[in-house]
């Protein structure tokens, strides 16, 4: 596990070195990934999508696909690297604890390798160094192009009609108690609104909710980004000495 953790630090390092504040990049990149994840839950709800497996896995997959769709390759790699790095940090912190087999989310290192695999699988020729630096085993790497193709076919079957009709029904930012989170999420909202016409409007609130989390609330068509989650990411970036 420590080898994988160290590897992701190296994967992220070239892109992070160009930025003025690597800690801010780590926090922002993870906020982007989580926001896309919650949007996945929203689309599953609004489009009444069939999910053959765990919904959390489907939302994770969409997060990687949207990062690749919205961002240029170098920036997308940084986001995926920082997101995977966060999973590796969580796994390291939980060493010695009994795995939470009851949890709806996959184990942190499973999510780590899935993120790396799906990103690598979109362009194996040009992302081989990324996969190698992230210690993606050859056995898994051999299937990543197929995994990515299946993910694209599955999600884009439903995303493409939304893209064809864009712009249309929009995502909007409502309450925003944290300026940093609001700045990050506002840019994503603007970009997504240009690319997709959603089934119904989604509002996003950034506010304290008493826990480190983010939610999609179906009855309200609302994504809640907890300020505690960003605080947790800042603490994690500080502890990792980014």
Enumerate the language-model features and the residues they cover:
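Short pre-active-site segment immediately N-terminal to the catalytic Zn-binding motif
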Residues: 19-33, 48-49, 236-242
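Pan-zinc metallopeptidase signature
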Residues: 98-192
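Sec-dependent signal peptide recognition
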Residues: 1-7
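N-terminal signal peptide c-region/cleavage motif recognized by signal peptidases
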Residues: 12-14
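An active-site-proximal "capping" alpha-helix that borders the catalytic cofactor pocket
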Residues: 53-70
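Catalytic zinc-binding patch centered on the HExxH motif and its immediate surroundings
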Residues: 205-239
């Amino acid at each position: 596990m420590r080898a994988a953790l160290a590897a992701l630090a190296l994967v992220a390092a070239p892109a992070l070195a160009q930025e003025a504040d690597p800690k801010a990049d780590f926090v922002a990149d993870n906020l982007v990934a989580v926001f896309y994840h919650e949007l996945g839950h929203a689309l599953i709800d609004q489009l009444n999508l069939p999910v053959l497996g765990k919904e959390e896995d489907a939302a994770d997959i969409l997060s990687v696909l949207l990062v690749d769709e919205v961002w240029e390759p170098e920036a997308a790699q940084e986001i995926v690297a920082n997101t995977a790095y966060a999973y590796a940090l969580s796994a390291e912190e939980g060493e010695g604890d009994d795995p939470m087999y009851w949890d709806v989310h996959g184990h942190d290192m499973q999510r780590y390798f899935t993120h790396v695999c799906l990103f690598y699988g979109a362009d194996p020729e040009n992302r081989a160094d990324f996969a190698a630096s992230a210690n993606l085993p050859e056995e898994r790497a051999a299937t990543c192009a197929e995994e990515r193709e299946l993910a694209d076919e599955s999600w884009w079957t439903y995303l493409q009609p939304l893209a064809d009709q864009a712009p249309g029904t929009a995502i909007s930012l409502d309450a925003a108690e944290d300026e940093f989170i609001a700045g990050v999420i506002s840019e994503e909202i603007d970009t997504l609104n240009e690319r997709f016409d959603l089934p119904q409007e989604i509002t996003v609130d950034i506010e304290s909710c008493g826990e480190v989390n983010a939610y999609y609330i179906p009855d309200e068509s609302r994504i809640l980004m907890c300020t505690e989650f960003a605080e947790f990411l800042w603490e994690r970036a500080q502890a990792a000495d980014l």
